[in-house]
Curated annotation (Swiss-Prot):
Protein residues bound to a nucleoside 3',5'-cyclic phosphate: 374-493
The name this protein goes by in its record: Potassium channel KAT1
Annotated organism of origin: Oryza sativa subsp. japonica (Rice)
Membrane topology, Cytoplasmic segments: 1-60, 110-132, 184-197, 291-718
Pfam families reported in the protein's UniProt record: cNMP_binding, Ion_trans, KHA
Region feature (Disordered): 560-584
Extracellular side: 82-88, 154-162, 219-245, 266-269
Length: 718
């Protein structure tokens, strides 16, 4: 005896549903027990048939056709055929032969043990199981009773013989098993499978009741005192078709409780049968109505929930007096949710194993993410890791996705539709830019750790890919080379912007947290490449003064293209000499400390040592009563800077302020050891003797190799 053969999953669950075998699909095998080795041996004993064999499944389907024939002919013979025609008798015997073959075949068909769920192919166990269960019923439903009775009594049309023929209705259990498998078959619609089953049960009940009621009338001594004889006195001489249709008519009117009254019981036997039939109809009607109601309610439940949510949202908006535009956004959200509920992308993906989710995400999102400018040139591994974090979402028209001055938000890529980039100028909203398919938004605020500079609102029904800012940063940190390419793409994108519209209530955190250039956003978004921040307000080259107002202090910015030269000392900051330069007056409040920031940005021409794409930013920080210190940082457009040319900005950390508020920075070349760094700090800051260095995030640094070009280092005395 071999048990086991761990055989498939799919057909065990579907109870024997046949699926085409292939290396890329589920095979007809059973699930092994936990910890068992899968499929060591799938070969059954000799002459043993697998219940999942395609040929055996075809044989079962052929028998289903014969079962349907037997279910119809048995009640019909009992009621309408007193003498069985020889041709019909031959057909009956042929059908019985097929079922007799199936009885023999069953002794060689393996079965699944109900306790172990393993396939049993031992002949003795198969025989014992069959003999102790359905063998007797199968034999009785297949035995040729008419030839046996003719052999002993020579009366083949006896009523007892015909009643014994009803044992063939036992074969209907095969139809029940068939419908059970079809209901779980993904190739067939569940609704129509259930409807077919209910219709089949109803038709069979109508057929049997009509045949039995006619048999009672046909064998009643007084034909005129029967339900059919009362309206058709010579009904026995009528055609078989007329009598059969009349019987079905009575049966269906009684089943549906219509009861026209033209056909009714005339004798006690018929009355008794009608009572039993109508009692049966109560249960059958409850079964049919219950199942149909369940199917219909299940199909309309989504619509009912949608209408309830719309009504609740409308009442909520009216009760709280929400503006009309917000109310429309809420209603549009529910409408779109109803339309896309059937998709259930994320719910479905969460139910799948990680390997399948990876394949689906790679197939759907990889081409879209690859086309985004931010990821242009990054490695395929970076994209492959990123697609796993992408979620596809739908947004209705005019829905705000990101709000201006909102905290850090996620990054979005437009798959379809369009998104308007909106800015508020003097209280009025203006469309600054329109994001089309394949473009992205939200990346500036997320990557630069700043509030969102714009409001992003859908212009039409849009499908967006949302990338979590947290996961994006983690992936960037894990892929240092790709992060350089990515940030360079962001820099190039920002340099393409020629101007920035005036904004009300600018958030000063934008200036303090923006670590990419360490200059205000107005500087890197202006068309001109050189700015000057000094004490007094002047004008730009066009005699225009862009105003960025809205907080308690006014800010006026002027830009002018100038050329200047600067000399660089190895361990000192570059100092730019200003001659006849326009001036910008800036007042701001950072962390409750009001200081004046003077920013000067110089760009070299094509004859300079560096290319025109290299921008020199000189940031002067101080107050009117302090000596200004100059900080110069050059930001190249190349992907990286050679290790030998690492330059960092050192700050004297004051214990009564935060790290981000440390002032008086010095730009130096990074030495080879911390001791040299402390020595340079002592030279640059007189009377200061540092013994410890921390990063901008207050992380202690104990090895110069972890310091990157352009880092800001804060020296502490311990």
């Amino acid at each position: 005896m071999t048990q086991a053969h761990s055989k498939s999953c799919f057909h065990q669950f579907w109870d024997g549903l046949q699926i085409k075998r292939s290396s890329d699909s589920f095979t007809v095998e059973l699930l092994p027990s936990l910890g068992a080795t899968i499929n060591h041996s799938n070969k059954l004993q000799k002459f043993i048939i697998s219940p999942y064999d395609p040929r055996y499944r075809s044989w079962e389907l052929f028998l289903i056709v014969l079962v349907v024939y037997s279910a119809w002919i048995c009640p019909f013979e009992l009621a309408f055929l007193r003498d069985l025609p020889s041709k019909l008798l031959l057909v009956e015997n042929i059908v019985d032969i097929f079922f007799a073959i199936d009885i023999v075949l069953t002794f060689f068909v393996a079965y699944v043990d109900s306790k172990t769920h393993l396939l049993v192919d031992d002949r003795k166990r198969i025989a014992m199981r069959y003999l102790s269960t359905w063998f007797i019923f199968d034999v009785c439903s297949t035995a040729p009773f008419q030839p046996i009775i003719l052999l002993f009594t020579h009366k083949g049309n006896d009523i007892a013989f015909k009643v014994l023929n009803l044992l063939r209705l036992w074969r209907l259990h095969r139809v029940s098993s068939l419908f059970a498998r079809l209901e779980k078959d993904i190739r067939f619609n569940y609704f129509w499978t259930r409807c077919s089953k209910l219709i089949s049960v109803t038709l069979f009940a109508v057929h049997c009741a009509g045949c039995f009621n006619y048999m009672i009338a046909d064998r009643y001594p007084n034909p005129e005192k029967t339900w059919i004889g009362a309206v058709m006195s010579t009904f026995r001489s009528e055609s078989l078709w007329t009598r059969y249709i009349t019987a079905l008519y009575w049966s269906i009117t009684t089943l549906t409780t219509t009861g026209y009254g033209d056909l009714h019981a005339e004798n006690p036997t018929e009355m008794l049968f009608d009572i039993v039939y109508m009692m049966f109809n109560l249960g059958l009607t409850a079964y049919l109505i219950g199942n149909m109601t369940n199917l219909v309610v299940h199909g309309t439940s989504r619509t009912r929930k949608f209408r309830d949510s719309i009504q609740a949202a409308s009442e909520f908006a009216a009760r709280n007096q929400l503006p009309e535009n917000i109310k429309q956004q809420v209603l549009s959200h529910f409408c779109l949710q109803f339309k896309t509920e059937g998709l259930n992308q994320q719910v479905m993906l969460d139910c799948l194993p990680k390997g399948i989710r990876s394949s689906i995400a790679y197939s759907l999102f990889f081409p879209i993410i690859r086309q985004a400018y931010l990821f242009n040139g990054v490695s395929g591994n970076f994209i492959a890791e990123l697609v796993m974090e992408v979620q596809a979402e739908y947004f209705p028209p005019k829905e705000d996705i990101i709000l201006q001055n909102e905290g850090e938000a996620d990054v979005y890529i437009v798959v379809s539709g369009a998104v308007n980039i909106i800015t508020t100028i003097h209280g009025n909203e203006q469309v600054y830019e329109k994001i089309a398919e394949g473009e992205m938004f939200g990346e500036v605020g997320s990557l630069c750790n700043i509030p969102q500079p714009f409001t992003c609102r859908t212009a039409e029904l849009s499908q967006l890919l949302r990338i979590s800012k947290t996961r994006l940063r983690e992936i960037i940190e894990e892929n240092r080379e790709d992060s350089n390419i990515l940030m360079n793409n962001l820099v190039q994108k920002l340099k393409l912007r020629e101007s920035l519209p005036d904004m009300n209530q600018p958030d000063r955190r934008f200036l303090s947290k923006y670590e990419l250039f360490h200059v205000p956003r107005e500087a890197w978004l202006l068309k001109k490449s050189q700015l000057h921040y000094t004490e007094h307000t002047s004008r730009d080259s066009s005699n225009n003064t862009p105003v960025f107002g809205g907080d308690r202090y006014s800010r006026q910015l002027l830009g002018e293209a100038t050329r200047s030269s600067a000399s660089e000392n190895e361990n000192s900051s570059m100092t730019d000499k200003e001659e006849n330069h326009d001036e910008v007056h800036t007042n701001c409040e950072i962390k409750k400390r009001t200081e004046e920031h003077c920013i000067q940005i110089n760009s070299e021409d094509s004859s300079s040592t560096y290319s025109q794409r290299t921008m020199n930013a000189t940031v002067q920080t101080g107050s009117p009563h302090k000596t200004e210190e100059n900080i110069t940082r050059r930001i190249p457009d190349e992907y990286y800077i050679k290790e030998a040319n690492k330059r960092v900005t050192i700050h004297k950390y004051r214990h009564n302020s935060t790290v981000s508020a440390a002032q008086n920075g010095k730009l130096i070349k990074l030495p080879t050891s911390l001791e040299e760094l402390f020595k340079i700090g002592s030279q640059k800051f007189q009377g200061f003797h540092p013994r410890k260095v921390v990063s901008r995030d207050y992380a202690e640094i104990d090895d110069v190799s972890v310091i990157r070009d352009g880092d800001h280092l804060f020296l502490l005395e311990m």
